[in-house]
Amino acid sequence: MPVLSEDSGLHETLALLTSQLRPDSNHREEMGFLRDVFSEKSLGYLMKIHEKLRYYERQSPTPVLHSAMALAEDVMEELQAASVHSDERELLQLLSTPHLRAVLMVHDTVAQKNFDPVLPPLPDNIDEDFEEESVKIVRLVKNKEPLGATIRRDEHSGAVVVARIMRGGAADRSGLVHVGDELREVNGITVLHKRPDEISQILAQSQGSITLKIIPATQEEDRFKESKVFMRALFHYDPREDRAIPCQEAGLPFQQRQVLEVVSQDDPTWWQAKRVGDTNLRAGLIPSKQFQERRLSYRRTTGTIPSPQNLRKPLYDQPCDKETCDCDGYFKGHYVAGLRRSFRLGCRERLTGSQEVKVPVGAESQVLLTYEEVARYQHQPGERSRLVVLIGSLGAHLHELKQRVVAEDPQHFGVAVPHTTRPRKSHEREGVEYHFVSKQAFEADIQHNKFLEHGEHKENLYGTSLEAIQTVMAKNKVCLVDVEPEALRHLRTPEFKPYVIFVKPAIQEKRKTPPVSPDSEDPATPLDEQQQEMAASAAFIDQHYGHLIDTVLVRQDLQSVCSQLRAVIESLSKDTYWVPISWVR
């Protein structure tokens, strides 16, 4: 092994160490990391600078004099008085050049050590308590970005203190400003008797560098306690409309279903978070889960927002109600098991017209929609496919859509065979068209919560059981099920991992007459009654169940929406998705 000489520097030591690294089966990654680090050119340059500085410290050079500039001026004055020889004129010209004068000025500055900052003298009338406090001068360099800190007035001492540090902001990156620090001056302006909003305005107007005079907090907060919690927002939020937020400029707006990375939960009222996928590295303020729940509970109590039990529900997507039609499971001459008319045939008769409908009371109806903790999930080979749940507004024709997709690939897709109490017809087979059971057995299953949905049509009971869905999934098929939105809460379990797709019809305003020219204005006619019902149905689902929806498909025609649906289902086995954290634990 080569031996280093006593005069070898750190740079040569690192070079030799890099050449001596050998891969080890147990520490291959660590060895690779060290080799990459030691081979970096930037590290080599730093080592050379380090050696130069160490050499300088060992030599300890001292200046011959501390006023070279003054000496040069004296020499120039003598030469100007008697400038005869050419050498004297050349020396005078050389000493007069700006570059040499600048070098001499730098020499004097270094020799006199005038490069250290000089603090202003303390005022004569300063109190004794202030003299005992350690004052810290902090200079931050920032662009047009905010400082990344909020301030408040301490109720007991009246001092202006730092209330919070925004993760990723200028103050956080500096590591010099902490929660609890007392702010005394901003760019030489005292802030002892100014309001927090006046101080914020001074900070906002400061561009480039900003100098703060602060008194450090007695107990420094733990700045690096990252929570690394991912939350899906179940509501829309705009800090400009929130009067409770301590600083609107520090707020983080987000949309429903957007995933947020919560980086700090130190404040029980206001969390700090970032939008996942956002290029902005600075965190913003969002209401905490507890605070948002209290606000929603208060608004619900006072009637500001309606209670779920009192919602007026419009019609959802309805199946065909004819006894003989292509909805009976036949598609292009082939029969597909389970593709029968939905049990909601009876619901169509009962819900015709506008009437007050109570949303089923359950755990979901009492939940205050704030945040849902999520984690990344990717389907693994050999794992059961996720349940694909279709919900549709009026006019979506889900049964037709489901029928087309399953019939085109029955080996890959399947549907749950429903239960019924009606008598079996001569051409029907048990477990193919329906599971035929007695009314007593059907009602017993209802009592044991075995049905996802159930209803009555012409004095016969129809229903889709959870067991029927499990049977399809056990065959390694993608199970398609269409339900009313209220039933989604029964399916949101780790077993099913449902992917919810909302299908709504395309609604376009009709023109009275074709326009004469492209520039002519021809107002569209209002939506007819049927289109208004479709629009109201879609708006209701989006407003009250949008937090449960993963994808929205707009049905222009059957072929296009089928292609979109198949593409979405295909991506479920390839892409990574955010799901409730309870589904992956």
UniProtKB/Swiss-Prot annotation:
The modification Phosphoserine is found at residue 307. GO terms for molecular function: PDZ domain binding. Residues 137-218 form the PDZ domain. SMART domains: GuKc (SM00072), L27 (SM00569), PDZ (SM00228), SH3 (SM00326). Its main location: membrane. Disulfide bonds: none annotated. Residues 510-530 are annotated as: Disordered. Residues 385-570 form the Guanylate kinase-like domain. Belongs to the MAGUK family. Interacts with HTR2C; this interaction stabilizes the receptor at the plasma membrane and prevents the desensitization of the HTR2C receptor-mediated calcium response. Interacts with HTR2A. Interacts with HTR4. Interacts (via PDZ domain) with CADM1 (via C-terminus)Interacts (via PDZ domain) with CADM1; this interaction connects CADM1 with DLG1. Interacts (via Guanylate kinase-like domain) with PALS1. This is MAGUK p55 subfamily member 3.
